[in-house]
């Protein structure tokens, strides 16, 4: 039996599921009566999503459809960081949606402090855009996981626990 057990806390999402959600959103937008003539375009890159429509109301409707499709595909809505709608050419409206991936250093420090204060027997370590929590007792690590699941509403990014050993 290993002397120390550990798990990683990461914040990531399935890129293919996001592609599928965007495709389904475009398909629904093209068939919906209220959005059919809105000229909606959605451009997806690795780090952002650009939604363009003819009015702010259409933009909000597309956003609602996108969120519904993302939830059905088991994607957290916390991955979307919506920017302010801006005017685009031709009287259109554009909104840039930044996709959140990884745990930034400020949040990693906050999570590390939360874990250390509550569980003195485990050692959280920041590793780039993830956090490794190590401890001797598996029960203690499972308690940390349960604690983080309870606090999920306070954390601005979706968390996944991986590499539990």
From Swiss-Prot:
Higher taxonomy: Bacteria, Bacillati, Chloroflexota, Chloroflexia, Chloroflexales
InterPro entries: DUF520, UPF0234-like_C, UPF0234_N, YajQ-like_sf
Entry's Gene Ontology molecular function annotations: nucleotide binding
Gene Ontology CC terms, in alphabetical order: cytosol
UniProt superkingdom: Bacteria
Role according to the record: Nucleotide-binding protein.
Protein name: Nucleotide-binding protein Caur_1852
NCBIfam families: PRK05412.1 (NF003819)
Keywords: Nucleotide-binding
Family: Belongs to the YajQ family.
UniProt source species: Chloroflexus aurantiacus (strain ATCC 29366 / DSM 635 / J-10-fl)
């Amino acid at each position: 039996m290993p002397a120390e057990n550990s798990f990683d806390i990461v914040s990531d999402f399935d890129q293919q599921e996001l592609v599928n959600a965007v495709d389904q959103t475009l398909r629904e937008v093209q068939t919906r009566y209220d959005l059919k003539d809105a000229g909606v375009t959605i451009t997806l890159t690795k780090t952002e999503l650009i939604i363009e429509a003819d009015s702010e109301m259409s933009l909000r409707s597309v956003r609602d459809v996108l969120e519904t499709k993302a939830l059905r595909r088991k994607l957290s809505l916390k991955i979307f960081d919506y920017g302010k709608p801006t005017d685009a050419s031709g009287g259109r409206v554009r909104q840039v949606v930044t996709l959140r991936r990884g745990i930034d250093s400020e949040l990693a420090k906050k999570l590390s402090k939360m874990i250390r204060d509550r569980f003195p027997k485990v050692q959280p370590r920041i590793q780039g855009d993830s956090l490794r929590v190590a401890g001797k007792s598996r029960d203690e690590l499972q308690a940390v996981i349960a604690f983080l699941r309870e606090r999920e509403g306070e954390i601005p990014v979706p968390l996944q626990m991986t590499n539990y050993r």
